[in-house]
C-alpha cells in the first residue's frame, strides 16, 4: 500500500482589479488581455453591458462589472485593461483597472458556490489566499436570460444597415444611365 496521495487539483485564474475589489476568471476562458480602447455605446443593451469594441474585426461586448457588482463607476482610463474571454460561443471583454497576476489556486483554497447570485452578484466561487480573497466571476451567469436577449437584439440592430439604405453594392445608378 502506498501512503502517497494525489495532490489536489488546482484552478488557474487570471486575477484582476475592479473598483478596488479583486476578481478572477478561470484561465481556460481567457483569450487575451488588451489595453483599453474607446468603448462604443450600444443602444438597447442592458446596463451591465458597457458597450462594444472591435478586436481584430470581431465586435465584442464589454461587460460592466462595476454595474453588476454595485461598485462605483469609473471612466475609462488609458491604463485600464480589457480582458477578453469566452463565455460559451461568445467572446466578451471585461473592463478592469488592472490585471494582477496568474495564480494557481489549490482546490483546498477554493470555495465553489455554483452560479450563486447574491442580489445581482454572480459568482462561481471564492479563492481564499494568504493575501486576501479573489471573487471568481461566473461568465455564463453574468447576464440573465432577459439581458442576454436584450444584448442579442442590440447587437443585431447595430449590425443592420441604417434605415433607408440598401445593402446593394455599387451605390445608386449613375446619372443618365438607363435602367
Model-found features: residue ranges?
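An acidic, low-aromatic, low-complexity terminal/linker signal
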Residues: 1-179
Amino acid at each position: 500500500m502506498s501512503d502517497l496521495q494525489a495532490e489536489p487539483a488546482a484552478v488557474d485564474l487570471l486575477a484582476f482589479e475592479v473598483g478596488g475589489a479583486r476578481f478572477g476568471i478561470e484561465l481556460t476562458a481567457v483569450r487575451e488581455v488588451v489595453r483599453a480602447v474607446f468603448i462604443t455605446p450600444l443602444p438597447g443593451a442592458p446596463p451591465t453591458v458597457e458597450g462594444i469594441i472591435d478586436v481584430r474585426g470581431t465586435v465584442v461586448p464589454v461587460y460592466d462589472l462595476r454595474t453588476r457588482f454595485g461598485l462605483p463607476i469609473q471612466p475609462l482610463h488609458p491604463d485600464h485593461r480589457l480582458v477578453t474571454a469566452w463565455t460559451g460561443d461568445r467572446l466578451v471583454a471585461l473592463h478592469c483597472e488592472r490585471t494582477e497576476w496568474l495564480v494557481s489556486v489549490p482546490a483546498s483554497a477554493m470555495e465553489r458556490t455554483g452560479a450563486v447570485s447574491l442580489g445581482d452578484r454572480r459568482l462561481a466561487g471564492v479563492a481564499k489566499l494568504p493575501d486576501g480573497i479573489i471573487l471568481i466571476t461566473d461568465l455564463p451567469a453574468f447576464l440573465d436570460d432577459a439581458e442576454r436577449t436584450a444584448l442579442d437584439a442590440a447587437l443585431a440592430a447595430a449590425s443592420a444597415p441604417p434605415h433607408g439604405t440598401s445593402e446593394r453594392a455599387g451605390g445608386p445608378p449613375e446619372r443618365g444611365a438607363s435602367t
